[in-house]
Amino acid sequence: MFLPRPDFRIALSICFMAVSFVISRFGSEVRPTLLLALPLVLGHVSTGLIGFVLNVIAGHHSTVTLAASTIGTALLWLPMLVPMGTLISLTVLVSQLHGAERERDIGPLFRQALWLAMLLGLVMFTFLSVVPALLPLFGIVPDIVPGAAKFLHVVRWGSLAFPLYFCMRYFCEGMHCTFPTMLLGFGGLLVLVPLSYALTYGRFGFAEYGVEGLGIATVTVMWLQAVVFALYLWRSRRFAHLQLFAHLELPCWARIRDLLNIGLPIGISILMEGGLFIVTTLLIGRFGTDEIAAHQIALSVAQLCFMIPMGVAEATTVRIGHAVGRCDLLVMRRVAWAGYAIVIGTQTLSASVLLLGYDVIVAAYTDDLVVASLASKLLLFAAIFQFPDGLQMLSSGVLRGMKDTRVPMLLAMISYWGLGMPLGLGLGFALEWNSRGMWIGLIIGLTAAALLLGWRFRVVSERMFAGIP
């Protein structure tokens, strides 16, 4: 049922040699980045563990429940990616204002970002209200559609809480304050685990809601995290001088436009990448319940691994933004290379875990032998794309800190939708490789993005050093 483990010692040796070389030259920047990134990574890991827990609970409830939650979660993430990406502009601008010692401008900027977050939440709610009626049009197996629709009808009520939480989180990260993200992430996990279990299986006096229970638990955690974060910022002495909630401001469209000019290309870039995975999930739904369940197992593990380079990339964005605000280009470049060294190291570790322990990982999700066999094969593909996935994420973070967002958006479109998706469709459907073909498309798209974004970083940094705008 399971594949033999390959000998990858040579590849590991090359990766560790590369990391050692970069650290020897830029090691002084590795430690500050790690200190800033660690709470972010742990916060992201807690988010990934939430997905892991939900999938384990759904998978042991039934294969249909897991498949329905997979489709529902995929369609939930589609609108969530836009506010996640767009509001990153707040981190970029706050870090640069902080670096330039213009803190009096941070409070007004934050209040306008809250208006933008509410607007994005309204868009998200509208999408999640409409899309359940369109599920039959996607060609998904009919058994999955009712559960996915119920899940989406429930989770839409968290549409406002989600962007507000990220708005507050990105503000904190721009101010080099990353511990709230970690604490709220694990706090949400502690609430979600027992609540989702109770609502899905009907334990502790609750009725058995099945996949709807997963949605109810998710919405509850979204609102708890948003409310607690708001209370923290309101009461925190660290940010008292910024007067974040000193008064209510009407929307200032000029400031909101500034946020959108930087953030919308980031949001579209993230949508391009996330959309590739989401559409891949919907297309694999055509191959049957076993294929989609196996895909979700492999994807959730890959997403958990992805949380590490994501946290490192966000920390790198903040540090580069701070350096740009101080006009310190040498530090900017050193911070970027330190980020690459860290990511190569983390992705080597992630790939090693997947290659060595895929059978143990799959066993934690399901005891269905057919699903387990398919998932174990897909986890090997997940191990392969750890490197391009981490490197493209880090390059994106570096470019965001440099306020270069529009060209990376175009490069993301080319990589994911000009290369990855067409190849995945050809291999998955034309050659009938099913989910394996679609995953090869993912690997090609991520590899292209890693190469193109790395090239873009080189071009932009050389222009900045030459004084070319």
Curated annotation (Swiss-Prot):
Where is this protein localized, as stated in its record? Cell inner membrane
Chain's role: Multidrug efflux pump.
Q: Does the keyword Protein transport apply?
A: no
Question: Where's it mainly located?
Answer: membrane
* Entry's Gene Ontology BP terms: monoatomic ion transport
Q: Which GO terms describe its molecular function?
A: antiporter activity; xenobiotic transmembrane transporter activity
Task: Identify the GO cellular component terms for this protein.
Answer: plasma membrane
Q: What is this protein called?
A: Probable multidrug resistance protein NorM
Write down the membrane topology: Multi-pass membrane protein
Residue intervals passing through the bilayer: 10-30, 34-54, 74-94, 121-141, 179-199, 214-234, 264-284, 292-312, 335-355, 369-389, 409-429, 437-457
User: Which keywords accompany this UniProt record?
Assistant: Antiport, Cell inner membrane, Cell membrane, Ion transport, Membrane, Transmembrane, Transmembrane helix, Transport
What family name appears in the similarity comment?
Answer: Belongs to the multi antimicrobial extrusion (MATE) (TC 2.A.66.1) family.
Superkingdom of source:
Bacteria
